[in-house]
C-alpha cells in the first residue's frame, strides 16, 4: 500500500532539489531522514518535511507500520516562477525568474492490498 505527500511552491529551483532527492530514493524512511538531517542544503530540510508528512499520512490514514516504510517514488516538478526585474545600465532591465518546486513523495510498505 502507498501513501503520498506533496509540498507545493517551495522557493528552491528544481535543479537544486533533484540531486538531494537522488540520495534518499529507494531507502527506508528512517534512514532517509537520517541522511537528510546532516546535509547542509535548504532542499534537504524541505524534502525531510515532505517525507515526514508522507509517513504521518501512511500511519494515520492507512494504518501502515512506520518502521516498514520505504521511499518508493520521490520527484520534483517545476512550479510557477516569480518574475522580478533587475535594473541594468543605460536604463535597461533584465528579467529574473525565481523558480519554485513541487515536491512529491510516495512511501510504500511493500504489501499488496
Curated annotation (Swiss-Prot):
A Pfam family for this UniProt protein? Ribosomal_L22
Q: Which InterPro entries match?
A: Ribosomal_uL22, Ribosomal_uL22_bac/chlpt-type, Ribosomal_uL22_bac/org-type, Ribosomal_uL22_CS, Ribosomal_uL22_sf
The lineage's top-level taxon is: Bacteria
Q: Name one GO cellular component term.
A: cytosolic large ribosomal subunit
Q: Which UniProt keywords apply?
A: Ribonucleoprotein, Ribosomal protein, RNA-binding, rRNA-binding
List, in alphabetical order, the GO biological process terms annotated in this UniProt record: translation
Q: Which GO terms describe its molecular function?
A: rRNA binding; structural constituent of ribosome
Return the Gene3D superfamilies for the record.
Ribosomal protein L22/L17 (3.90.470.10)
Family, per entry: Belongs to the universal ribosomal protein uL22 family.
Q: Tell me, what does this protein do in biology?
A: This protein binds specifically to 23S rRNA; its binding is stimulated by other ribosomal proteins, e.g. L4, L17, and L20. It is important during the early stages of 50S assembly. It makes multiple contacts with different domains of the 23S rRNA in the assembled 50S subunit and ribosome.
Q: How does it assemble?
A: Part of the 50S ribosomal subunit.
Q: What is this protein called?
A: Large ribosomal subunit protein uL22
Give the source lineage, highest ranks first: Bacteria, Bacillati, Chloroflexota, Chloroflexia, Chloroflexales
